[in-house]
Structures are given as structure tokens and as C-alpha cells.
Amino acid sequence: MAGILAWFWNERFWLPHNVTWADLKNTEEATFPQAEDLYLAFPLAFCIFMVRLIFERFVAKPCAIALNIQANGPQIAPPNAILEKVFTAITKHPDEKRLEGLSKQLDWDVRSIQRWFRQRRNQEKPSTLTRFCESMWRFSFYLYVFTYGVRFLKKTPWLWNTRHCWYNYPYQPLTTDLHYYYILELSFYWSLMFSQFTDIKRKDFGIMFLHHLVSIFLITFSYVNNMARVGTLVLCLHDSADALLEAAKMANYAKFQKMCDLLFVMFAVVFITTRLGIFPLWVLNTTLFESWEIVGPYPSWWVFNLLLLLVQGLNCFWSYLIVKIACKAVSRGKVSKDDRSDIESSSDEEDSEPPGKNPHTATTTNGTSGTNGYLLTGSCSMDD
């Protein structure tokens, strides 16, 4: 075991040339990041998850009810053993031939069977109230952590001159504010990892899981080898658009369509500007070129930059989805569907949609268009 640990913590991998772990031990004069500090993230992640449950029940839910957001979920499909067996064992989306066979077997018309399968697919999906509460929690956290990050960074020299991320590296003392910022972000991402399996499932579950893994690894990696200064820039930059996204979703669930559209436009502008403009030209420039000039490359430097390039790849993917949504919104006159959502249609739409009608333009009995306008979800921080 000792040999494995010695191999894993090899100084030649983690640290620049001629630097040892002994050089980064805490002293009375200076405190440096220590790997054991990160253990604190696990109990804090649990605490954040518990705070979320309390917040959603006692803060977000009353707000949703005050906005007349429905608490009821989709209509439950009537019990039918034959259809249930087909649904669970064969297919959730029967083709025309199977529908005709079931119609003869049950003496139901095809439209009734189609409706049953739609209701059955949707009956376990959460209500709009649940979605609103989830978005309000994320909005509140993202707003807080982004505000904290801005207030912290505006007092630091590396915000105004990124070369300060590498001056005297790795002998850069760890301040209390920086330590708090890092542990808070890491704890939140661990809580997302746990809650992703109980939250609303979306089509991009795998991509978001990968994103959370990369985020956790980047935060952990940059803390251990004391790249925390540039790490704070990455974190704050990727947090900048997330609160706007969740605000747009809340406006959508509350049926404030004009506000939803405005917030989505603001989100899209901030997201694309920060992820495709500022991040590569400012952050990647300093991690790839300024650090090479001032510190020089070493093994963990390559890994860190490869992870940042992977994050940039995810940024490009999500930017593509945002542009895709924006183009659809222009053609329809409003934002009406999240390309990453798992939603097929609203519960009302399931009952009223005639065969062959375009689900994106169908009008529900609630007076909304399409699929209640579910937007792009998730934070993309070191994110998103």
C-alpha cells in the first residue's frame, strides 16, 4: 500500500522540477493546500444536499404555489395488465403494427392505446412544481457562489493580470477565502453527483455525469498541486451564466413567457461570450502559454490542460445546443423546448394532441405552446 501511495504522489508528476511536497508543508508563516483538506468536501456535500431538501420544501415550494404552479403530476394511465407487460418487457414506443395487434386483442381503438402509452411514459415524471423547486435551488446556489467568486476575485491581482497565477508558483499561500471558495464548489459538485441519480432524468445524463466527473477532478487536481489561482478564474467564469439559465426556467414554469425569452437571450449571450470567447482567449491562454513561459511544463501541467480542453469541448457542445434552441425560437416566436430535456410533452398535451400533430407547436389546455418550454439544463462549470 505504501508503494502505491508513493507512486501516486510522485513529486515528479505533480510538481515542477526541483520542488518537493516538503516544500509545501504548512508553516507558521504560510499555509498551502493539503490533499487531506479535500476530505471536508464529503460531509459538506451531504450538508448541502440536506439544505437543498429543506430549501425546496420550505422556500421554493411556497414560492411556486404563490405563482399558481401546478402541484399535480401527469395523468396516471389506467391499469391494464397486457399493455403494462408490453411497456415493461417489450417496448415503450410500440410501432404501428404492434398497435394494431393490441387494438384487436383489447378491442380498443389505436388512438386510445397510443394515449395509454403516452400517459404511462409520463406518469413517473415529476410535476412542474417539482421542476420549479429544483431550478430555484440551483438558481439560489449559483447566484450565491458566483457573487462570492466575483467579490473574492476583484481583490486579487490575478484577476487583472493572469500572469500572477504563476509568479512564485507553487509557493503561493492559501488564503481563507480561496480555501472556502474551493471547498464549497467541490462540495456542491459532489452533491450533484449524488443527486443526479434522483433528480429529473434528461437525455444528456451521460454527458452531465462526465461533466461532473471532470469538474470534480479539475477542482481536486488544481487544489492538490496549488493551481488554485487559475482554478478560481475557471470556476467563476463558468458560474456566470448558470443563474440566468435557472431563472429562465423558473419564469417558464410560472408561464412568464416574455421574461423567459429575455432571460434565455441573456443566458445565451453570457454563456457563448464566456465559454467560447473569454475562456479560451483568457484562461486557456494563461494555462497553456503564460504558465509555459513562467513555470514551464511538467507532467501534471499536461493533464490539467487536457482537462481544460475537455471542458472547452463540452462548452462547444452546449453552445451548439443553445444556438439550436435559439434558431427554433426565432422560427416559432418564442423559446419552447429544451433540446436536452427528457420531456416528451406535458400531461395536458398527452390527452389533447391529435395524431401526427407537431408536438412543438401544439397548444395545451393550459394555454402554453409545445412542451411547456423546458430549457437547456445543468451547470457547466469547471462546469459547466
From Swiss-Prot:
Membrane topology reported for the UniProt record: Multi-pass membrane protein
Cellular component aspect of the GO annotation: endoplasmic reticulum membrane; membrane
Protein localization: Endoplasmic reticulum membrane
The keyword Acetylation is annotated on this UniProt entry: yes
Gene Ontology molecular function terms on file: DNA binding; sphingosine N-acyltransferase activity
Effect of R131A: Abolished ceramide synthase activity
Spans traversing the lipid bilayer: 35-55, 178-198, 205-225, 263-283, 303-323
UniProt PTM comment: Phosphorylated at the C-terminus by CK2. Acetylated. Deacetylation by SIRT3 increases enzyme activity and promotes mitochondrial ceramide accumulation.
Upregulation: Up-regulated in adipose tissues in obese patients.
Recorded metabolic or biological pathway in which this protein acts: Lipid metabolism; sphingolipid metabolism
Catalyzed chemical reaction(s): a sphingoid base + hexadecanoyl-CoA = an N-hexadecanoyl-sphingoid base + CoA + H(+); sphinganine + hexadecanoyl-CoA = N-hexadecanoylsphinganine + CoA + H(+); hexadecasphinganine + hexadecanoyl-CoA = N-hexadecanoylhexadecasphinganine + CoA + H(+); sphing-4-enine + hexadecanoyl-CoA = N-hexadecanoylsphing-4-enine + CoA + H(+)
Compositional bias annotation for Low complexity: 361-384
Alphabetical keyword list: Acetylation, Endoplasmic reticulum, Glycoprotein, Inflammatory response, Lipid biosynthesis, Lipid metabolism, Membrane, Phosphoprotein, Transferase, Transmembrane, Transmembrane helix
InterPro entries the UniProt entry points to: HD, Homeodomain-like_sf, Lag1/Lac1-like, TLC-dom
Domain of life: Eukaryota
Function: Ceramide synthase that catalyzes the transfer of the acyl chain from acyl-CoA to a sphingoid base, with high selectivity toward palmitoyl-CoA (hexadecanoyl-CoA; C16:0-CoA). Can use other acyl donors, but with less efficiency. N-acylates sphinganine and sphingosine bases to form dihydroceramides and ceramides in de novo synthesis and salvage pathways, respectively. Ceramides generated by CERS6 play a role in inflammatory response. Acts as a regulator of metabolism and hepatic lipid accumulation.
Stored PANTHER family: CERAMIDE SYNTHASE 6, LONGEVITY ASSURANCE FACTOR 1 LAG1
Name of this protein: Ceramide synthase 6
Species this protein is from: Homo sapiens
